[in-house]
């Protein structure tokens, strides 16, 4: 059986990267929450 996690840096950046987060209102809300919490790393 094939494993579910097949790592790819390109897909990782496209799906969870900073620019993709900024592209939607919900994504911006996520970044805002993470800034408020004081996360060192905001996105992938």
Swiss-Prot record:
InterPro entries in UniProt: Ribosomal_bL34, Ribosomal_bL34_CS
Region feature (Disordered): 1-44
Coiled coil: none
Biased composition (Basic residues): 30-44
Ribosomal protein as UniProt keyword: yes
Pfam families in alphabetical order: Ribosomal_L34
Domain of life from the UniProt record: Bacteria
Keywords linked to the UniProt accession: Ribonucleoprotein, Ribosomal protein
GO molecular function: structural constituent of ribosome
A GO term from the CC aspect: ribosome
BP GO annotations: translation
Sequence intervals crossing the membrane: none
HAMAP family named among the record's database cross-references: Ribosomal_bL34
Family affiliation: Belongs to the bacterial ribosomal protein bL34 family.
Name the UniProt record assigns to this protein: Large ribosomal subunit protein bL34
Gene name for this UniProt entry: rpmH
């Amino acid at each position: 059986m094939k494993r579910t996690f097949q790592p790819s840096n390109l897909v990782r950046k496209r799906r969870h990267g900073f620019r993709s987060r900024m592209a939607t209102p919900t994504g911006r809300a996520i970044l805002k929450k993470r800034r408020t919490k004081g996360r060192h790393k905001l996105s992938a």
